[in-house]
């Protein structure tokens, strides 16, 4: 898109929004302050560098075999840098523990150290990014069906030690980069068939978490993540929503809400306001579940729009940490990053551009026809012209222009892998 066209369209959109009492410049400034936490695992289908030929376990699945998958740390970084160059704004990167710079050495998960992630810290600083971190319970000989909730004390100790070390790594990331790192704990623990020991397993998980959080990490924002089920673990998940919600609230931690980790008829957006009333902050994993936790690429759909609305309209942008979590191996992986990131940003922008003051005035007066009418009209306002201007401000391609950049990178880089 030509710059003069973008500017002209923005000026018209600005005037149109002003008629509804909305300041587009203020919305753009607010959008600029939202840092998405990009997930490193879209580059390589959650393979990591610990065991590149290993099998993905833990009830999760990356489907597809599109060529060009990143095979090592340099390719992962190059792909993230390319995606970053096509996404407006300043963003973070979320790493799993299996993405350490192990330099070809076998380092088991209860032996990981900050030194294995120092090159990531240096890379992030050089690329004007901050880092977040995740312990990794899956795809390991000791994963099985149970990790932190395993009745075998030795196995449980192994995973406690891994998680303690993961938090220390996150603490070092936060310290060196001057921004607290979100550390998220998600474990796959569960059962394929019926269990008669739910209370016991959950007691073990609570005990393990208590041991993990004995260690103080001042540069970390701690989060715990629930899930309804995983493939092969359909009948019981130890870390249910109720378990982690209770644990998070009682221990002053963040609860992580992943859009794919609930029943298809549950809406994550409806949980936001309740969680914010009892927790200082929450962590979100923006995803797109199709019938189950399929981790499809995020698109600009109703679920994402309503999620953004709840956050923006609650005035909670400074209390919600927004991460992406999906991995589609069936399409260009760099393109997947750009589509999902832009869709999420567009949802937040649309929420910011909605005349919420007028809508609440209608609602307070019982004028429900007017409320619904204005909500509907807001959808067709020229918000896309505002987003294109945001792209121009940040020096990235506007509109569909990024498609050519992704195709060029594929021709010159990923297709040769």
Regions found by a protein language model. Name each.
Residues 1-151, 158, 168-169, 175, ...:
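Alpha/beta catalytic barrel-like cores
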Residues 150-152, 273-274:
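Short, hinge-like loop/turn segments at secondary-structure boundaries
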Residues 164-167, 173, 179, 202-209:
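Extended substrate/RNA-proximal surfaces in nucleic-acid metabolism proteins
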Residues 180-190, 194:
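Aromatic- and glycine-enriched pocket-lining scaffold segments that form the walls
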Residues 188-190, 227, 326:
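Short linear capping/connector segments at secondary-structure termini
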Residues 192-303:
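Acidic/histidine-rich catalytic cores of soluble enzymes
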């Amino acid at each position: 898109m030509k710059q003069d066209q973008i500017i002209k369209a923005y000026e018209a959109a600005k005037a149109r929004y002003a008629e509804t009492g909305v300041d587009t410049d203020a919305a753009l400034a607010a959008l600029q302050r939202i840092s998405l936490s990009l997930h490193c695992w879209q580059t390589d289908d959650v393979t990591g560098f610990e065991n590149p030929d290993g099998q993905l376990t833990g009830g999760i699945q990356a489907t597809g075999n599109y060529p060009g998958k990143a095979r090592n740390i340099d390719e992962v970084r190059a792909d993230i840098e390319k995606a970053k160059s096509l996404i407006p704004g300043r963003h973070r990167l979320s790493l799993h523990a299996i993405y350490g710079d192990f330099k070809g050495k076998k380092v088991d998960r209860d032996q990981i150290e900050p030194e294995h992630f120092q090159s990531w810290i240096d890379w992030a600083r050089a690329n004007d990014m901050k880092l977040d971190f995740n312990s990794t319970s899956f795809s390991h000989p000791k994963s099985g069906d149970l990790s932190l909730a395993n009745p075998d004390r030795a196995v449980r100790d192994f995973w406690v030690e891994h998680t303690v070390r993961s938090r220390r790594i996150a603490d070092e990331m936060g310290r060196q980069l001057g921004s607290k790192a979100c550390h998220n704990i998600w474990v796959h623990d569960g059962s394929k068939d019926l269990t008669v020991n739910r209370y016991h397993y959950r007691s073990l998980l609570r005990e393990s978490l208590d041991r993990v959080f004995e260690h103080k990490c001042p540069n970390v924002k701690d989060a715990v993540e629930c899930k309804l089920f995983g493939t092969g673990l359909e009948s019981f998940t130890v870390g249910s929503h109720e378990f982690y919600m209770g644990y998070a609230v009682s221990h002053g931690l963040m609860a992580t809400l992943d859009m794919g980790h609930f029943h298809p008829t549950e809406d994550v957006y409806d949980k936001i306001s309740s969680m914010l009333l009892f927790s200082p902050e929450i962590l979100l994993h923006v995803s797109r579940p199709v019938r189950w936790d399929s981790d499809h690429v995020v698109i600009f759909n109703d679920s994402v729009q309503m999620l953004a609305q709840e956050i923006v309209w609650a005035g909670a942008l400074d209390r919600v940490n927004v991460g992406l979590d999906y991995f589609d191996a069936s399409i260009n992986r760099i393109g997947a990053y750009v589509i999902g990131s832009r869709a999420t940003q567009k949802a937040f922008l649309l929420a910011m551009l909605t005349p919420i003051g007028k809508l609440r005035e209608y609602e307070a007066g019982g004028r429900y026809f007017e409320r619904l009418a204005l909500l509907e009209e807001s959808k067709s306002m020229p918000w896309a012209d505002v987003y294109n201007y945001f792209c121009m401000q940040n020096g990235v391609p506007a509109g569909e222009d990024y498609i050519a950049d992704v195709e060029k990178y594929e021709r010159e880089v990923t297709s040769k892998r």
